[in-house]
Amino acid sequence: MDGVDELLLRKFNLTLPPGLLRTAFVHKSFSFENGACQNNERLEFLGDAVLGLVVSHYLFETCPEYTEGQLSAARSYIVSGTSIAQIAKELNLGQFMLLGKGEKLAGGMDKTSLLADLLESLIGAVMVDQGFESARDFVLALVGEKLRQVGEFSVDDPKTKLQKLTRTQLVYEVVTEGPPHSRTFKASVIVNEKRFFGQGSSKKQAQVAAAMSALASLENKSS
């Protein structure tokens, strides 16, 4: 894991114990093939909770004009699997993932779900080793660009702003997942022949998150 050590130290001034760091990169398919080897699922569980809390608190403090629904949509955009996996890809973390043979052949190191879980596991590892303050700083460093993008959406509702930019009638497709008592809504919208996704606890939140994703892409291209 020497490459990961160097990456964390160079970009985040962060060091982790070798054993804990390795565990953060062990997918369950690898541990299944290698006996009692511990995988990263518990760290991912913890990291997911830390990520959600840090982003929620940051948005609450810095976006006083946002309603509860807008806060939820912004958080959904930032912590979505797609967004977190994108950050992991930019850091080239997939190459360090320890996967089982089958998962590796299936291209696991490039899968959105596995990359998102990996980054959340890394957040969990920082939490375990160094506590909440260090984990918070790590999260804010990871998602800082996406937080900046969200801050630029405050003048207009993201769906309205996207409509103005594209000057087209946008159609949002929404699907639901999960049991009735715990529904998750996933929305998608096509802009310039590319599909953007978002999710939330309501149709509106999911649509706003999808609009935020599209806006972020459009504004990155124009900058």
Curated annotation (Swiss-Prot):
GO cellular component labels: cytoplasm
Transmembrane segments: none
Needed cofactors: Mg(2+)
Gene3D superfamilies: 3.30.160.20, Ribonuclease III domain (1.10.1520.10)
Domain RNase III as annotated: residue spans: 1-131
Protein keywords: Cytoplasm, Endonuclease, Hydrolase, Magnesium, Metal-binding, mRNA processing, Nuclease, RNA-binding, rRNA processing, rRNA-binding, tRNA processing
Domain DRBM, first and last residues per copy: 157-220
Compartments where found: Cytoplasm
The keyword Cell wall biogenesis/degradation appears for this protein: no
Enzyme class: hydrolase
Signal peptide extent: none
InterPro entries, per the entry: dsRBD_dom, RNase_III, RNase_III_dom, RNase_III_sf
Active site: D48, E120
Catalyzed reactions per annotation: Endonucleolytic cleavage to 5'-phosphomonoester
Self-association state and partner proteins as the record states: Homodimer.
Record function comment: Digests double-stranded RNA. Involved in the processing of primary rRNA transcript to yield the immediate precursors to the large and small rRNAs (23S and 16S). Processes some mRNAs, and tRNAs when they are encoded in the rRNA operon. Processes pre-crRNA and tracrRNA of type II CRISPR loci if present in the organism.
Family statement: Belongs to the ribonuclease III family.
UniProt protein name: Ribonuclease 3
Organism: Tropheryma whipplei (strain Twist) (Whipple's bacillus)
Taxonomic lineage of the native organism: Bacteria, Bacillati, Actinomycetota, Actinomycetes, Micrococcales
Chain's gene name: rnc
